[in-house]
Amino acid sequence: MVKALQYKTFGKPDVLQLVDLPLVHPKADEVSIKVSHVGLNPMDWAIMGNPEVAPNFGVKLPQTFAYDFAGIIDEIGPEVTDFKVGDHVFGTTMRGAATEQLIFSTKERGLFHRPDFVEDDVTSTLAVAGHTAAVALRKAHVTAGDTLLVGGAAGGVGIFTVQLAQILGAKVIGTASDSTADFLQDLGAEQISYGPGLADRLKNKEITAAIDLFSHETLKAALELGVKADKMSTVIMYPEPPAGIPTATGGEALPSDMEMILNAISNHQLTVPIAAKYSIDDYLEAIKLQMNRHAHGKIVLYF
């Protein structure tokens, strides 16, 4: 038997249960992964709490919680050629990642070899947030010389967006609470307080692009400052963003995006702060910490 964190009904984190599932063998094109770490994202509990939206993400009850993972391959099907037993891997799966054994079809996207220069706790945080940041930057056409406004810059996607934007040659100003000023400065960004009057506080900053990771306040301020819609993007789908501003999801990532992220880590251009690591048995504490939105960095569960 293997342990898994699942929900059988939609709702708040208290609907989650640790359950025992039978160990299974991979089919011809599948690999079995012994999961070591699970990276948490706000979408994990947002989808769990929204039965209207959940079907859009392929949720089928009972659903295994979370989507990002890292671990080691312990068995492969006879048709698998790109992976072998003992390979350290990471990625994302919409079938749910918080399980000691994850079966992954190699015909699907989303499974990557883990390089030696990075550990499982870090790679378990890369796929959803890193891919989403890469897509958001591409859709906002961020280039060298831009001054980019990032709304919600200290969050899980924000820490990737801030750093990847600088690799592209942009200057970054991030909205966040005043308590995160030093944290964002360490990532190379200037912090500015969110809330009423944002456009006024930004009027001398010469903003040329904007990415919204928290609320449409960022987009509204950027529009007020004259930023064009084709220089903006958002990860917030509901409510709909202002006309002409595209939404960005990690599912739209290019195959080259993860290679770019790993190269940035290898070249010390991108760091992934881990705010906290919790045993799978302490999943409620981990989720509650993320839900209060005051953690500086990613939150990880481990088996």
Regions found by a protein language model. Give the residues of each.
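C-terminal hydrophobic helical "lid"/dimerization subdomain
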Residues: 259-303
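Rossmann-fold dehydrogenase core element
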Residues: 230-272, 276
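Adenosine-nucleotide cofactor-binding segment
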Residues: 120, 147-150, 166-217
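Glycine-rich beta-strand-centered segment in the early N-terminal region that forms part
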Residues: 22-39, 52-95
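N-terminal Rossmann NAD(P)H-binding glycine-rich loop of SDR-like oxidoreductase domains
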Residues: 154, 162
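NAD(P)H dinucleotide-binding glycine-rich loop of Rossmann-like/cofactor-binding domains
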Residues: 91-152
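Residues forming the Rossmann-fold NAD(P)(H) cofactor-binding site
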Residues: 159
